């Protein structure tokens, strides 16, 4: 796998380092997964190359580049190295051997020099001062101080040091990450030449248009402040009104645990000096620790980063869970609510058995029509497409990008690992097992994959109207109360050939959300007692006449302004994500990572329903978005602040995820 520099430019000071690190954590820039190979060094280890690597992800403990460097010296929070002129190393060595014993061993970074008889000690005198007429924006004082600082008082000599002019500048930051206070070691290794700085050839991150909207988080600023090397002083030359001034506290409140960046630029624009995050081509595994909920003896897949919540190019999105892939997350079997309802389920076992027969009969009918449904899977003109724009997928894998089926990525929004279900990380999901107590997985057929779809906990999902789905009208589904807020398996309807009876299944995943009560008439969640003729979006009652697909009565919404709930979105929940510090936004902790995901491209439009009413997003909590009409996102604001609302339009593929801090319309 080829690697590229994270950024092309010059790290002048800590402010620049913060911008580079934050952009990497946001997914705007990419960190590198390995050291450069020897064949890559000639074009990677050059002036202007800036590399960021995360020690826990890349496994890089020691950076090697094959260059002979002087001993390090401290400049603020940075370490500075100068490349030695190998052609003159012999003469320097000879002179040193007859001189003082105060010397330093110079290696080429590959440990080979230590075993090479021709390698010898070189006495290093103070570095020659370099005075350049640099423009203020290029940090004259900062660069000058780097050139003025001597290596060590003991290295002073009249012997001139031969070096090429290439300089290596490094910095490391220890970042503590919630929820387990794990430590990530972030490293920056940058290269520049004295000539390029003199001629103003390299741009600083502060001056880069690509990074103009990046704001270092408070956690990162604190971590940088805790990095101490020598007598540290702030070399920042940014003004108080600069777009990237990290000392502007109003601009530094965005926590690292938010998915949404404040970048207004499209993430796939190849702006000068930028490289975007690209997904790794291999799956990393590591031995997890007890704090994550896994036993020490159990292996779990390593996250790309506990801080890279979202990777912008290309993003990976799950399609329908498929029995041949690791997306069949049967969380319902471990749900506490299922256990709590076992007694009632057992009492109704006779009724369940009767319903099972109906399920089996209906499934037989459905299976007979499977081929008709799957023949046109992925075709936007398919008359059997579900009303919710979902399709039935078969075992051959009707994925948007089938050639990428083996490629795995982890778009984690939080680092919370599902501690109750290690099966999240199995390479082969467990086969559905018939459960007579809960009516789950009835009539499972190996001839066609029947996927575990999850319904919205506060919606009827047409449970009482759809063929094959059991449960009493309006108040229960699969003999479990709808208001119990648990994922329900709509197994019987997955492959129904009739779109009229296929409104239930949604290939969605849950996340825990604190749902604020909005006082807007377009609110998605209204109190039950507000079901009046003047409020068409109020939560309706649980009467039998409740319209299919609308919310049922839920006492949890009636008595609390902020109620914990589980809300389900299809694929990407980012459009509802915002800063956890913004009380007017959804506040959530993503609890269910997506183990197997597939890249999404233009053909994703084929599985979208373009007929959504523009005003329905506020009243439709099941409104599943990849990219919908721009007005949908305007309406989603529902009267509250527009900050950090994700803005996705029809012109975007998921490679073009944007946020807009000023407005959500285009």
UniProtKB/Swiss-Prot annotation:
GO MF: DNA binding
Keywords from the UniProt entry: Cytoplasm, Nucleus, Phosphoprotein
InterPro entries: Gti1/Pac2
Pfam families for this protein: Gti1_Pac2 (PF09729)
Major location (coarse): cytoplasm
Entry coiled-coil feature ranges: none
Presence of the UniProt keyword Cytoplasm in the record: yes
Subcellular location: Cytoplasm; Nucleus
Calcium found in the keyword field: no
Signal peptide feature range: none
Residues with Phosphoserine modification: 152
Region (Disordered): 90-157, 232-254, 314-389, 425-479, 528-552
UniProt biased composition (Low complexity): 90-104, 233-254, 334-384, 460-476
Biased composition, class Polar residues, residue ranges: 108-121, 139-157, 314-333, 436-451, 530-552
Family named by the database record: Belongs to the MIT1/WOR1 family.
Role, per record: Transcriptional regulator of pseudohyphal growth.
Protein name: Transcriptional regulator MIT1
